[in-house]
Amino acid sequence: MFLFGIRSDCGTPEPPIPTTPSHHFSVRDALSQLPKYGTPGNNSLCSAQITTAKSPVLRRSPFAGMLFNGAGRPLNLEAPSMTLPASMGGNKTPIIDQRALEEPRIAPWIRSYHEELWSHGPTAVTSDIPPFLRRLTVEEAAAIQTFPLGMTWCGPRSAQFRQIGNAVPPRLALAAAKAVDTALNG
């Protein structure tokens, strides 16, 4: 949420026009700008293991519940990302299905796992995590938040994730600044 304080004689900022009226910027769109996972330019890897929750919390969407230990949830590659928190790092880092990322026709594993849990309850919990599930890289988090590719981040990996999560996404900041500029300068 943005709160703007502008004198009444300076005009009222209008909400920005959506920057993506016909096509939302999806997680897949953001990640497709980067080099292949694990190669230079996309190799600030998170080493936290992914383990399923012993007592998963289900929501209607497989991307909304707590199906894994920690606060890192799987990202829906076909939708805009939820806000990336400053607490990313370790098991709070979002999860990517690398197989579904590389092959868009393949349904993400999380969908079938969620269906099993929804249908069969706790008896469907598995500890067998497929090797193609992985954590988001620093570069991927930055791309999702619309930072320029190749931007340098400081400190250890957890500090880099915190910088990305604490910042206003650049495209959002630009849209808000333009709305204020238009209100003040016409």
Provide a role label for each language-model segment.
Residues 1-186:
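S-adenosyl-L-methionine-dependent DNA methyltransferase catalytic core
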